[in-house]
Structures are given as C-alpha cells and as structure tokens.
C-alpha cells in the first residue's frame, strides 16, 4: 500500500473514532503506529453513592512495512489475562489483515468482555474509504496538509524511512528525551535494517523488529536507564541479542555489598545479563540468563538461567515492557537473597546449560504450578 493510501485509511479511522468518542478513541496516529483508548464504564455504584469511571484501556498498534499483506500487531498496557486473550484471539484470526476489520473485531470483542452492547459506529468500518476532499480531510491542519504533499513525493520509500516522518496530531517525536549517542545507535540500526531489506537479507521478523525498536527507544528515555540503574548494549548491533548490566541494586542488600567487593577484587561492579529474543516476540518472552558474576540464591539456576514465571510462556504477556522486566529481575535477585560466589568457576555459566536448566524447571512448574515464596523467605 502506498503512503498516501495508508494515510487516507488512517484518517478515515480517526474521523470515526476521534478523541471525544464515547467508547473507542484513536488518540494519535502515525504511518506505522496507532495509540488508542477503550473507555470502560464504571460498575453499578452502591445505593446512594457514585463511582468514578476507571481509567481507559490503552492499546497500541504497530503497522508493519508489508501491510496489508501482513496484519498489524496489537498490544495493550495491562496485565489483565482477559485482555491478553482478546489480543491473542485477534492474532489467531488470520483473515483479519485489514486494519478496519481488525478494529471492528477488537472493539466488538472488548464490548463483549465488558458486557457492553456493540457500538453502532463499528458498522461504519465496512464502508469504502471516502474519495476526493470530502469527509476526513476537513479536520486536517495546515501542517498535516504540508506533510501530505510531501508524502506524495516519497511513496516509494521503505518502512524505515517512513518511521522517520514527523508525527502528526501534536504527538511528540518518538525520539524526544533520548540522548544523542543513543539516537545515533537507533539511526545505525535503522540504516542497517534498510540495507538488509534492500539486499534481501532481513533477519528476524517485521513484528519483532518493530516492537524491539520501540522497546529500545523506551529504555533510552526511561529514568531508570538515565539514572544508571542499568545499561543496555546490543551484541553485534543485533536487536535480538542484548547485554544488560545491572549497576545498582538495593543498597541495603548483601548483594550490594558483594558487588562493592567484586569491584575492588576484579574491577567488575555490575551483574551482566543476556536477553535473547526470537522472531515471535512479543508473543513469547525473551530468554534471559546471568552471564557474570556467578551467583547463589536469587532464583538463579544452573548455567545462569532465571527461575521466574514472568519469563515463561505461562507467565508472559505481550504487554510487558523490557524496562519493567529488567527492573523486576533486579528486584527478584535482591528478594531471593542473591550472593556473589567469589572464586567460583566462571565457566559454569553458559547458554547450553542455562537452556537445559530453564527447560527442566519449566516442566516441573507446568506440572506443579508456581508459588510465591513466604515473606520470611524474602
């Protein structure tokens, strides 16, 4: 689909579900992303009282470079398994590659989930796109009109160049709040991806690459990253292989004291983690293992794998951000009373052994379930 054709479709959708819609709102959009809200009514209040409406559900949609041949990818900012199931059902509906049909299916399913009647506006999604200058173009600002004229000259640009287009509807740039050196890394990745695409040597999937680029941008602008709690380095510039260094843990924990000693002895003042992502991310979790130092406790298994339900298919949600996963691992190591094993054989941590330990523990927990350790255990 051409840039102008995609833009026309997005404007059509935004004209139906505008920012004041009573049920579903397209808050902002770009050529490769939608930011939407589903408004949930409050439950019936007790007699003589009133309840404030709950916050709206926030949904994101990534539009891939091959749209409409491949379906857009949706995820939701919520841990609610019911909402995750809605998106999984949408993903399983292979015939819904059209953004309009996806929206119709999604809104109807969310209405069923919250026992709401089907909204009449969803029927408008079956209508053909307006032609000419009628309907959706009335609310376009002069800035948007200029962008539209520019778009006509760049219809043949590939996906990665499209992502660099200036945002509309007053939305802040996706790169705002990111330091220059990190912007340079993002730009290098975009250029590499573009060249690989032109050479027919694309690695990974469009879905995973788009989401990982978003996750990396979110990491670079996060306060925890800027405060030096952790750092991220891409191994061989690959979006699918990250080194994450945990520089700061709870200062009252024994692990913090151990890291101070480790710095004095070996010049290492961090815990090095490896995050490995597959083509089906974010629908499957990353594989995470400790690379160094060797730890005891902290739910760290043989080979450096981590015993966390969050990192299994059973406990994972496509809504989870990598930033939150990193911070959860940081907290779990402290909660599990992890300690540095000084003098331990460093070769005992490797990928093959970590995968073996991970697979074994997952099989055990699939049979017996997961549990939360009692407070006296940390």
Swiss-Prot record:
Gene3D superfamilies registered for this protein in UniProt: Ubiquitin Conjugating Enzyme (3.10.110.10)
Region annotation (Disordered) ranges: 126-152
The keyword Ribonucleoprotein is annotated on this UniProt entry: no
GO BP term, pick one: protein K48-linked ubiquitination
Record-linked SMART domains: UBCc
Pathway per the UniProt entry: Protein modification; protein ubiquitination
Cellular location(s): Cytoplasm
GO MF term list: ATP binding; ubiquitin conjugating enzyme activity; ubiquitin-protein transferase activity
PROSITE patterns to which the protein is assigned, alphabetical: UBC_2
Top-rank taxon: Eukaryota
Annotated ranges, domain UBC core: 207-371
Record's catalysed reaction(s): S-ubiquitinyl-[E1 ubiquitin-activating enzyme]-L-cysteine + [E2 ubiquitin-conjugating enzyme]-L-cysteine = [E1 ubiquitin-activating enzyme]-L-cysteine + S-ubiquitinyl-[E2 ubiquitin-conjugating enzyme]-L-cysteine
Skewed-composition ranges (Acidic residues): 140-152
UniProt key word ATP-binding: yes
Outcome when changing residue 235 to T: In strain: FVB/N
InterPro entries: RWD_dom, UBQ-conjugat_E2_core, UBQ-conjugating_enzyme/RWD
Annotated EC: 2.3.2.23
Residues annotated as the enzyme's active site: 307
Role according to the record: Accepts ubiquitin from the E1 complex and catalyzes its covalent attachment to other proteins. In vitro catalyzes 'Lys-48'-linked polyubiquitination.
Family of this protein: Belongs to the ubiquitin-conjugating enzyme family.
Name of this protein: Ubiquitin-conjugating enzyme E2 Q2
Species of origin: Mus musculus (Mouse)
